[in-house]
Design a protein with these regions (language model features):
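N-terminal secretory signal peptides that target proteins for export/translocation
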Residues: 1-8
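Bacterial N-terminal signal peptides
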Residues: 9-23
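Extracellular ligand-binding/catalytic regions of CAZymes and related secreted enzymes
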Residues: 26-38, 56-57, 67-68, 235-339
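Catalytic beta-strand/loop cores that center a nucleophilic Ser/Cys/Thr
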Residues: 28, 66, 72, 91, ...
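Helical hinge/lid and interdomain linker segments adjacent to catalytic or ligand-binding clefts
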Residues: 28-35, 44-143
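Nucleotide donor/acceptor-binding cores
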Residues: 41
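Active-site-proximal beta-strand elements of phosphoester/diester hydrolases
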Residues: 47, 228-230, 272-276
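A glycine-rich, often tryptophan-bearing local segment used as a flexible ligand/cofactor-contacting loop or short
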Residues: 108, 113-202
Length: 339
């Protein structure tokens, strides 16, 4: 008679199975995904901001994309050069960006990064390849390249390439806070005429909400930009708070839009940008659905967007409030696989 497996061997078998789905890469984490419409596609998510906890938001987003939709996801982080921990204050180091060489979609959520040429080259090559981009919150001011001049035009305040990567590729650079930061939150209102856009499938008007405030943008947005969601400034930090009176909501600022970008080599890419996306914002199901739907759209897979995309949270998700210096210290990418 066979003896039942011990708890040790049961655990070992479980870990072996789990390791085929997710593992720690040299500088990030890789989630292989499972069956689903995204199977066979590779999304690289690049984090690195000091305030809005992209290091928490993007791993959760990757888990949703991999577990619920079948995408392979690689998540990269700002890494402390001395101890290998995730450190958003390390502005000059996001190792592993060579993963972009095989990516089908880049999702970027960085702020004022000053990356060395050998890392930045992978970003620039990706942007010029015509492959799609999804951008969140501070990605409008993703780079502040001071150490090297090679790719300085990508800086948020570039005069050579007006507004840099943010303005030229995504549609806007950093302008200002439009809502009162930390005191006024954001409700998402569907832009007139966009009700049937595939990215908005399954999203109700006013359903999207987040505690991070509305960013100011210049109107109209450039080129072929199409606003999808307008940010209604709320007088308070709860989704039930009333709209702010006065000029803040007249007009409302776009907080999510789509556009195209054609690079120097003539390749044209689909671009989705949202100035929402703080880690706490992703607790809102409507915003998660917006971003996941946008991934399908960016990849030219809008026919795969169902009536109500499954964007249920995966595992534990307790995001920290947005603030400078508020990240969890001592965490390595491999630690995130156990959460």
């Amino acid at each position: 008679m066979r003896r039942p497996p011990s708890a040790f061997w049961t655990l070992l078998l479980y870990l072996a199975a789990f390791s085929t789905l997710s593992y720690a890469a040299a500088a990030g984490i890789v989630l292989q995904g499972d069956a689903g419409p995204g199977k066979g596609k590779h999304i690289v998510l690049v984090s690195g901001d000091e305030e809005y906890r992209s290091e928490q938001a993007l791993p959760q987003l990757a888990k949703i994309l991999a577990t619920r939709q079948g995408f392979k996801c690689t998540v990269l982080f700002a890494i402390n050069r001395k101890d290998g921990t995730i450190d958003p204050d390390q502005r000059d180091n996001i190792p592993g960006l060579e993963a972009l060489d095989s990516a089908d979609l880049m999702i970027i959520f960085t702020r004022f990064r000053d990356l060395p040429d050998e890392q930045m080259k992978h970003v620039v090559d990706y942007v010029e390849s015509g492959r799609p981009i999804g951008a969140m919150r501070t990605a409008t001011h993703a780079f502040d390249l001071k150490t090297s001049q090679t790719y300085q035009q990508y800086s948020w305040n570039s005069k050579v390439w007006d507004g840099g990567f943010g303005r030229q590729v995504l549609g806007e650079t950093w302008i200002d806070h439009h809502g009162h930061h930390g005191k006024q939150s954001t409700r998402g209102i569907i832009a007139k005429g966009q009700e049937n856009h595939p990215i908005l499938r399954g999203i109700q008007n006013g359903e999207i909400w987040g505690p991070a405030d509305v960013y100011e943008v210049r109107l109209p947005l450039p080129g072929d930009s199409q606003p999808l969601i307008l940010g209604q400034v709320l007088d308070g930090m709860r989704p039930t708070d009333p709209p702010a009176a006065g000029k803040q909501n007249d007009p409302m600022m776009p907080v999510a839009w789509v556009k195209s970008y054609t690079g120097k080599q003539g390749h044209t890419a689909r671009i989705f940008t949202t100035t929402m996306g703080a880690a706490q914002d992703l607790q809102n199901e409507g915003l998660r659905r917006l971003i996941v739907n946008a991934c399908f759209w960016a990849l030219g897979m809008e026919d795969k967007i169902p009536a109500r995309t499954n964007v249920d949270l995966v595992g534990e998700y307790q995001p920290l409030p947005f603030k400078f210096g508020g990240f969890s210290k001592g965490i390595k990418p491999s630690d995130l696989l156990m959460r």
